[in-house]
């Protein structure tokens, strides 16, 4: 049995959870999330907690036990608090700006790169170099932040590019001069 899966998930105030078999719907102040969990687990609501249990002792069922518990916990936290990822743009002339729901990134290419925010995701830019991706779905926030970082990943020589806030870039020494 999974150590993570064993612990019940508390449901905070202002959050409602509805279960329909393996379909879980969570509504809260920040929005609503729906997800269908894979087979091999059962989800029950006991008082103000959600309990996830494996249906059998098969390996696949035990593997999915902790995963499903974490997915439901992330949904509950997402609709109550929300998630955000911060990115930093490093380099001369590199900047970002928001136009409506579109993030426009100038990262040293011959053209600016435009990214449309999917439903449930918002982009915010501070000082033209700090981008914040926020939303209720943890997976979607992480994927969008990774797509932005992939526009110009940080390079190891000067550290230019788009990196996560707090990310350490392993620096390399440049060419050594002629001897």
Swiss-Prot record:
GO terms for cellular component: cytosolic large ribosomal subunit. Belongs to the universal ribosomal protein uL6 family. This protein binds to the 23S rRNA, and is important in its secondary structure. It is located near the subunit interface in the base of the L7/L12 stalk, and near the tRNA binding site of the peptidyltransferase center. It holds the Pfam family Ribosomal_L6. Keywords: Ribonucleoprotein, Ribosomal protein, RNA-binding, rRNA-binding. GO terms for molecular function: rRNA binding; structural constituent of ribosome. SUPFAM superfamilies: Ribosomal protein L6 (SSF56053). Part of the 50S ribosomal subunit. InterPro entries: Ribosomal_uL6-like (IPR000702), Ribosomal_uL6-like_a/b-dom_sf (IPR036789), Ribosomal_uL6_a/b-dom (IPR020040), Ribosomal_uL6_bac-type (IPR019906), Ribosomal_uL6_CS (IPR002358). The lineage of its organism: Bacteria, Bacillati, Cyanobacteriota, Cyanophyceae, Synechococcales. The keyword Thylakoid does not apply. It comes from Synechococcus sp. (strain WH7803). The keyword Isomerase does not apply. HAMAP family: Ribosomal_uL6_B (MF_01365_B). One of its GO terms (biological process) is cytoplasmic translation. This is Large ribosomal subunit protein uL6.
């Amino acid at each position: 049995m999974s150590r993570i899966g064993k612990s019940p998930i508390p449901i905070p105030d202002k959050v409602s959870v509805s279960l329909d078999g393996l379909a879980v719907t969570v509504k809260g102040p920040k929005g609503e999330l729906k997800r269908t969990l894979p087979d091999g687990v059962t989800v029950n609501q006991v008082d103000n907690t959600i309990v996830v249990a494996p249906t059998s002792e098969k390996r696949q069922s035990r593997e999915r036990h902790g995963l499903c518990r974490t997915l439901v916990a992330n949904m509950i936290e997402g609709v109550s608090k929300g998630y955000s990822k911060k990115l930093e743009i490093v380099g001369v002339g590199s900047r970002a700006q928001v136009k409506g729901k579109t993030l426009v990134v100038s990262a040293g290419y011959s053209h600016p790169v435009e990214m449309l925010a999917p439903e449930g995701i918002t982009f915010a830019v501070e000082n033209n170099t700090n981008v914040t991706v926020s939303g209720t779905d943890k997976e979607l926030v992480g994927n969008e932040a990774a797509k932005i970082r992939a526009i110009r990943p940080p390079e190891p020589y000067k550290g230019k590019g788009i990196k996560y806030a707090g990310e350490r870039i392993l620096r390399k020494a440049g060419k050594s001069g002629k001897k």
